[in-house]
């Protein structure tokens, strides 16, 4: 669906995200049932999860710690006093027919994060996005509808309660986002922060991070919000961006044609790349919230809060800034290297072992990244240790080997690890950098190709590439490129 350019310039989107982050605790939020992903259906359940008579929930203290740390990392104010509430709704994936959540007294609120947005053909910019609140709640079970992707049209439904009771942190943003690109970047930055903290793996494919989008359209320059639509079922950051871009076009078309925009929940159809109406949107009054009577209030002392704050790691934005300042890296390089904490840790260990910061970055973002991505690994999984990568970089810097030789031995290092210096010595790959030795090799080469030499001196200068190639072939790429080019130039010109 495509709108004309003038129409696009008349409206702006107002976008907020509700992000559910599964907290990586070993047991569930209110019971000792396991949270392991991928187990047989209905094997990680217990009487508390199923809401059987006589059972009482007990708050997992690790969940509270993770929620507070996440709130602190999002620059939120941590509530010294908060509570749990019952959110009532009747659906088969909720065995108790209510969800234990937090309503009017969340554990954290009034925060923000800063995102960096780089769109093709546009100047990159940073933007501060408000975080309205972060609250704790339990996850629901999972429904599988036979014969359809939703309840309507299915012949029957199966329910798996393994996910029920898994701890969630729901993070609600302010409606500060304006484009699909901004929303996708916000979601990615949230995931980076959660992974750096170690409170969640943020795996969207496994449902560890799920985003719902709230979006409305209004004429530019006005403050009044349009009719809000919620979008669900986006399982990647690209899907978030595409769903928003489609929905912006759809809502603009509605306004232009006089068709009413309905307040509803819509599903993103990945196959057709469209949003589809799912149901009318409930208001908070539909859930009949009231305080959870089986759980006491949550109190976080100043001492406890500051103890948890002191345990926070350096976060992605802080690392990006430091890499630019300390290592002189570009914003792009700093962003790539800090995307995964394991990559950042590996990079810093490589530099600490003596490697040049820029050269180490180039290797990690180039050949090593290609290998890691192709094999679906993390850098930390590699047999090649940071100190060995530093040794490889230093061998090149010292002129012991060429970059070409380094690339030739890299596959072995990535697969088996070991000392680059030892491999170079064992295979006789040390770079030839003695001028007298190179001069002798060049003399032999020119003597072996008199015809080409004559043609070169007659004006066919493109043949210089032929001689360079032959010299590299003759030495197995071991000859010092810069020095050999100088000597070859001198000899060719007679």
From Swiss-Prot:
Gene3D superfamilies according to UniProt: 1.10.10.410, GatB domain, N-terminal subdomain
Recorded hits in PROSITE patterns, A to Z, give: GATB
E.C. designation(s): 6.3.5.-
Q: Name one GO molecular function term.
A: asparaginyl-tRNA synthase (glutamine-hydrolyzing) activity
Which keywords accompany this UniProt record?
ATP-binding, Ligase, Nucleotide-binding, Protein biosynthesis
InterPro entries annotated for this entry? Answer: Asn/Gln-tRNA_amidoTrfase_suB/E, Asn/Gln-tRNA_Trfase_suB/E_cat, Asn/Gln_amidotransferase, Asn/Gln_tRNA_amidoTrase-B-like, GatB, GatB_C_1, GatB_Yqey_C_2, Gln-tRNA_amidoTrfase_suB_CS
Matching entries from Pfam families are given as: GatB_N (PF02934), GatB_Yqey (PF02637)
Q: Which GO biological-process labels does this protein carry?
A: glutaminyl-tRNAGln biosynthesis via transamidation; translation
The protein's enzyme class = ligase
Please indicate which superkingdom the organism of origin belongs to: Bacteria
For this protein, what reaction is catalysed?
L-glutamyl-tRNA(Gln) + L-glutamine + ATP + H2O = L-glutaminyl-tRNA(Gln) + L-glutamate + ADP + phosphate + H(+); L-aspartyl-tRNA(Asn) + L-glutamine + ATP + H2O = L-asparaginyl-tRNA(Asn) + L-glutamate + ADP + phosphate + 2 H(+)
The keyword Zinc-finger belongs to this UniProt entry's keyword annotation: no
Write out the function statement from the record: Allows the formation of correctly charged Asn-tRNA(Asn) or Gln-tRNA(Gln) through the transamidation of misacylated Asp-tRNA(Asn) or Glu-tRNA(Gln) in organisms which lack either or both of asparaginyl-tRNA or glutaminyl-tRNA synthetases. The reaction takes place in the presence of glutamine and ATP through an activated phospho-Asp-tRNA(Asn) or phospho-Glu-tRNA(Gln).
What's the subunit arrangement here? Heterotrimer of A, B and C subunits.
Q: Which family does this protein fall into?
A: Belongs to the GatB/GatE family. GatB subfamily.
> Which HAMAP family does the protein's record reference?
GatB
> What PANTHER family is this protein classified in?
GLUTAMYL-TRNA GLN AMIDOTRANSFERASE SUBUNIT B MITOCHONDRIAL AND PROKARYOTIC PET112-RELATED, GLUTAMYL-TRNA(GLN) AMIDOTRANSFERASE SUBUNIT B, MITOCHONDRIAL
Q: What is this protein called?
A: Aspartyl/glutamyl-tRNA(Asn/Gln) amidotransferase subunit B
Q: Which organism is it from?
A: Synechococcus elongatus (strain ATCC 33912 / PCC 7942 / FACHB-805)
């Amino acid at each position: 669906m495509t709108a004309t350019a003038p129409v696009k310039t008349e409206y702006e989107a107002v976008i907020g995200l509700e992000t559910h982050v599964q907290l990586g605790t070993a047991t569930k939020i209110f019971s000792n049932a396991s949270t392991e992903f991928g187990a047989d259906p209905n094997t990680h359940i217990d009487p508390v999860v199923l809401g059987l008579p006589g059972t009482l929930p007990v708050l997992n203290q690790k969940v509270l710690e993770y929620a507070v740390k996440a709130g602190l990392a999002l620059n939120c104010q941590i509530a010294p006093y908060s509570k749990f509430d019952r959110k009532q709704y009747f659906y088969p994936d909720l065995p108790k027919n209510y969800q234990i959540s937090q309503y009017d007294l969340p554990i954290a609120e009034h925060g923000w994060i800063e995102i960096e947005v780089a769109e093709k053909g546009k100047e990159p910019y940073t933007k501060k996005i408000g975080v309205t609140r972060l609250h704790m709640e339990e996850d629901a079970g999972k429904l599988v509808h036979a014969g359809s992707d939703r309840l309507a049209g299915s012949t029957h439904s199966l329910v798996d309660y393994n996910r029920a009771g898994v701890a969630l942190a729901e993070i609600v943003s302010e409606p500060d986002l304006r484009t699909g690109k901004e929303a996708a970047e916000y979601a990615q930055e949230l995931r980076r922060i959660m992974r750096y903290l170690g409170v969640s793996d943020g795996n969207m494919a496994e449902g560890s991070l799920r985003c719902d989008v709230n979006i409305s359209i209004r004429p530019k320059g006005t403050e009044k919000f349009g009719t809000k639509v919620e979008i669900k079922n986006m399982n990647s950051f690209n899907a978030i961006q595409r769903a928003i871009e489609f929905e912006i076009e759809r809502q603009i078309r509605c306004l232009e044609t006089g068709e009413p925009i309905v307040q509803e929940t819509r599903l993103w159809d990945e196959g057709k790349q469209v949003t589809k109406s799912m149901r009318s949107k409930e208001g908070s009054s539909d859930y009949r919230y009231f305080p959870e009577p089986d759980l006491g209030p949550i109190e976080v002392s100043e001492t406890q809060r500051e103890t948890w704050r002191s345990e926070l790691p350096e976060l992605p934005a802080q690392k990006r800034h430091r890499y630019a300042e300390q290592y002189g890296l570009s914003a792009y390089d700093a962003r790539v290297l800090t995307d995964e904490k394991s990559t950042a840790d590996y990079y810093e260990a490589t530099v600490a072992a003596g490697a040049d910061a820029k050269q180490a970055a180039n290797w990690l973002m180039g050949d090593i990244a290609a290998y890691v991505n192709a094999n679906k690994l993390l850098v930390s999984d590699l047999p090649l240790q940071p100190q060995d990568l530093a040794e490889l970089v230093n061998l090149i810097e010292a002129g012991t080997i060429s970059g070409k030789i380094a690339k030739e031995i890299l596959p072995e290092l990535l697969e088996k690890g070991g000392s680059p210096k030892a491999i170079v010595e064992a295979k006789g790959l040390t770079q030839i950098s003695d001028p007298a030795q190179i001069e002798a090799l060049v003399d032999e080469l020119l003597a072996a190709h008199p015809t080409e030499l004559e043609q070169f001196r007659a004006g066919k200068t493109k043949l210089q590439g032929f001689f360079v190639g032959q010299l590299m072939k003759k030495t197995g790429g071991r000859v010092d490129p810069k020095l050999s080019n100088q000597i070859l130039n001198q000899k060719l010109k007679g």
